[in-house]
Amino acid sequence: MTDRPERRLARRAFLRGAGGFALAIPFLPSLLGSRVAADASTSRRFVGVFSLNGQFEANWHPDMTGAATVAPNTLARSLTDIDGPISNIIGPQFDGLRDKITLLRGLDGLTESGHNRSFPLTASAHTEGGMERGSAPFFPYSVDAVLEHAPSFYATPPVLGAMRLSPMLRRYNGELRAGESFSWWTEDGVTTRLPVQSDAEVVFRQVFAGSEPSEGPDPNERRQLVIDRVKEDFDRLRTSPRLGGQDRERLSNYADHLRDLQTRLAAAGSVTCTGPDVAYLEDAEAMYTNHIDLLVAALACGITRVGTLFIKHVRADGEMAGFHSNSHLSGPEAERTSAGLNAFIATRVAELLTKMDAIVEPDGNTLLDNSLVLWGNELGDGGSHGQLDMPMLLAGSACGRLRTGVAIDYRSEEGVTWTNGGKRLGRPYSMLLTTAMAAMGLSHHEWELGDGPGFGDYQKLGHRYAKGGGWDRYADARREMLPHLWMG
């Protein structure tokens, strides 16, 4: 062990243990000195969260009574002005987050598609055959992958380019079914559907315990908490006179977070060598909590700056409870059923946001403030099974680049509809994704990977069913940011 671990730790952000074991820790600016710490830039993070089967309009969108016109075809209302729950889906669990979230309406996918699990981060339909047959999107790039490969986002290679989580329960004789990936990247003419992780224990071992799942650590090491494996280095750093009070608290909170997470995983029976607890493996709520805690820890300590989380389940017992079939129905009963099922998903999202907002970073902002979390869906209105009027919730301001605490409606004036008298049209959904990437510090040169400007699929421009000019007014606006959301 070195006599000056704090000098090395400040630069590399690792604690060392026996056998070369290394544990990443959060950035601790007090070890760098005031001048260097003041010059250190805050890293932005991006998280994409996805759910299925669309939303009923009556459930998702807030009351916009009293909304102000803030730009052409753009209305906005403060979320703090809404009495009671924001909506039937965005309920009391978001009350403490009202000034940190943004709800968007009037963003339309310009793609011909039904169920499309890759849409939220590609703005593209799948080629013939559908996703179930493994076909790629027409535009085979997802935002998370673009960020992972962007030099302006990762100036130096990260420990992990992105943490992609698709939690699945251990059913079917204890076997873990493979999760679904909605992330894509194309390089040298080869399109790849990027892998996801579905087992929290495997992710923990790979990222925090330093072992590959195929080999696994020694059984004694599997029972030992990772913090205990670096105890000497941890204690020396924690008691260092150079470590400031806020950084000491930050380090202790991080250690407590990992201890609690690893203890819960051990109780499930997979971190130790005992058999899994069947009741736990059917508890979707606990499963998502473990994956959320993994993601938050990885973002907080700089292991990665990009994450995705697929929330498939709608009940704690893991049953789907007719989630898909109900999306094809209409009327008050179907709306109530959908609200009840989506409440489970919304609570998981609120848990993620609340935990990110509880971590105070060296610049005084929270991890959530310095991030952009995008909760999207594969569909708009589930009944129509299309991508018009996508239900979108954003959280975090990406270090002040995006406006929060508001609901924004981008729908056009009356008469600009899908078919005569149909749904009012808004702006291209792809404008949200380019705004998100700009908020992460990218230039259009890094996301324009197709044949022209913009991002995603623009099949419906000029469509005969798009009345009143449809989206044609935005045909030349593919590099523009979403008004009122974008603060620069």
Regions found by a protein language model. Give the residues of each.
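Ligand-binding pockets and gating/stacking loops
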Residues: 2-488
